[in-house]
């Protein structure tokens, strides 16, 4: 296994926004760099990898050579895109970072991802290449994008020729297409190195060729932490989607329930209104009838019947009084002995001198005497009052 310190130069220029490499040049490059860092650190525990960017406001070192893969991958997030790459300055700064490596036994290697046009002339690039060769620094170049630029491959080939010593440097031209940038690089010397593919690279290539054999295309035997992180992330996303779907279903059910409640309330109000309308109709009818009676529009037959009953009662009352007076007059006549005696004497066959008739007449009260007594008693009462 080769003990090596590597600096990877990333192209973050404006051309990385293009989508000729899925999903974009920058994303495809980032995936390839992540896989390359894993291959380097897994091939030898003492290998170190550093990252720098070539565009933007200037060349910027994201991390110096380190064996901490987590630190290397973390510095790749949130890259700024813009400007043009400064290839010669980036190579010189990468060489300086390798010169200050902690383990001097490590071989030095620079890997350049060039996805945008090269503005430098061949002569300037050859000068930089010769300097690398003098300091025993190997160079790998990944040329992608700008397929119609014929000068770009020639410039990069000239740079590689100036650096190459014992075929320790390599260049890979990756045309745009359906294949991912990382998948193409897996079988190239950039990944496999001069001594053949390591176990990590071979397993990664097998996973890329048959990614459906493992969850998320990652073999848990090679990188269990990555496989676990991907699985946890997928479970969290699934739980979030299920919660969102459940919430949407609950909201839809609540809306339907509210609609049914509103419909039932409207029906209840309508029924109550109909029920209340009937008594009001009756009250209105009674009110109309009372008004009609007050203006004389109602049939007064019942009142006429009551008047007839009242007249009949008055007539009966007066008849009773007349009968009482007649009875009183009759009683007065029967109480008069002279009248009875004259009546009996006028009857044929009746002898007024008969003792039985006389006894009967004697038993009758003398009305005249009673009248005189009443008059005398009334006079005495008047005298006493005086």
Swiss-Prot record:
Residues 241-281, 344-386 are annotated as: Disordered. Residues 262-271 have a biased composition (Polar residues). The modification Phosphoserine is found at residue 263. Disruption phenotype: Displays reduced seed germination, growth rate, stamen number, genetic transmission through the male gamete, hormone-induced cell division and increased oxidative stress tolerance. Is also more sensitive to abscisic acid (ABA), salt, sucrose stress, heat shock and DNA-damaging agents and shows a decreased sensitivity to cytokinin and auxin. In flowers, epidermal cells in petals were larger than those in the wild type. The gene is RPN10. Plays a role in maintaining the structural integrity of the 19S regulatory particle (RP), subcomplex of the 26S proteasome. Plays a major role in both the direct and indirect recognition of ubiquitinated substrates of ubiquitin/26S proteasome-mediated proteolysis (UPP). Binds and presumably selects ubiquitin-conjugates for destruction. Prefers multiubiquitin chains rather than single ubiquitins, with a binding affinity for 'Lys-48'-linked ubiquitin chains. Acts as a potential docking subunit for both ubiquitin receptors RAD23s and DSK2s. This is 26S proteasome non-ATPase regulatory subunit 4 homolog. Residues 241-260, 366-386 have a biased composition (Basic and acidic residues). Pfam families: UIM (PF02809), VWA_2 (PF13519). Residues 5-190 form the VWFA domain. InterPro entries: PSMD4, PSMD4_RAZUL-like, UIM_dom, VWF_A, vWFA_dom_sf. Component of the 19S regulatory particle (RP/PA700) base subcomplex of the 26S proteasome. The 26S proteasome is composed of a core protease (CP), known as the 20S proteasome, capped at one or both ends by the 19S regulatory particle (RP/PA700). The RP/PA700 complex is composed of at least 17 different subunits in two subcomplexes, the base and the lid, which form the portions proximal and distal to the 20S proteolytic core, respectively. Interacts with PI4KG4. Interacts with RAD23s and DSK2s via its UIM3 and UIM1 motif, respectively. Keywords: Phosphoprotein, Proteasome, Repeat. Phosphorylated by PI4KG4 in vitro.
